[in-house]
Swiss-Prot record:
Keywords: Cytoplasm, Initiation factor, Protein biosynthesis, RNA-binding, rRNA-binding. Component of the 30S ribosomal translation pre-initiation complex which assembles on the 30S ribosome in the order IF-2 and IF-3, IF-1 and N-formylmethionyl-tRNA(fMet); mRNA recruitment can occur at any time during PIC assembly. Disulfide bonds: none annotated. InterPro entries: NA-bd_OB-fold, RNA-binding_domain_S1_IF1, S1_domain, TIF_IF1. The lineage of its organism: Bacteria, Pseudomonadati, Campylobacterota, Epsilonproteobacteria, Campylobacterales. One of its GO terms (molecular function) is translation initiation factor activity. This is Translation initiation factor IF-1. It comes from the Bacteria. It is found in: Cytoplasm. Transmembrane segments: none annotated.
Amino acid sequence: MAKDDVIVVDGKVIEALPNAMFRVELDNGHVVLCHISGKMRMHYIKILPNDTVKVEITPYSLDKGRITHRYK
């Protein structure tokens, strides 16, 4: 899968789940299950509920995503 295949959207974290998983509500109202990208894990970037984040979603599974950026 090439990097061009991802859909990038913004969303708001509504719930923190075990194993660094998060439930994120996207700007269009959909709720997806997301995990943190490897670079964010390496740099110990903490994500809390009500944070605004950038999410990458593949067209193959629209209900799962990857958090790649946390806005300040």
